[in-house]
Amino acid sequence: MISVREATVDDVDAVREIGLTTWPVAYDGLVSPEFIADGLAQWWSPEVVERGITRGITLVAVVDERVVGMVGLGQEAGFWVMWKLYVLPGYQGQGVGKALLDGAIGALPVGTDQLLLDVLVGNEQAIRFYRKNGFGAPRSTPDRDLGDELIWMARAL
């Protein structure tokens, strides 16, 4: 059974394990090994993970008392953005990602009208998952150019 709960600082190591395990697999062949190494150092350090837990919304999925997935949300220019949603490879395809997404939407403030995310061009597995779960082209986005590597997706709420 999958349970989703708010992350605490006691989950920093488990959340980092998810990032350090999933990033190399998720982005292999899509970006350079240097990009992966830089991203792991920049976005999955203990300090950054703890800051996400204490200042944003971070939820974890638990199966058999093990943290197996995480989702992180924050605000940018008044928009709610899902910055991270990762599930350990051995638990993918079992509803963990959907449970995390549902939990994330439920954790947003009342009145939030859309949830944004950015996704790497070519990450077809992620794009399929998000489309299957109601994401498409956004109505509006923060005034930030994502370049050619990322695209915005949104789900109306």
Where are these regions (language model features)?
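Conserved glycine-rich acetyl-CoA-binding loop
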Residues: 66, 84-102, 120-128, 132-133
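Non-catalytic, surface-exposed connector residues within folded enzymatic/regulatory domains
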Residues: 30, 94-95, 147
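C-terminal "cap" of GNAT-fold acetyltransferases
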Residues: 79, 113-157
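Acetyl-CoA-dependent GNAT
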Residues: 6-12, 16-90, 101-108, 138-143, ...
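Extreme N-terminal starter segment of soluble prokaryotic enzymes
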Residues: 2-3
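Short coil/turn segments at alpha/beta junctions that flank glycine-rich nucleotide-binding fingerprints
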Residues: 94, 110-113
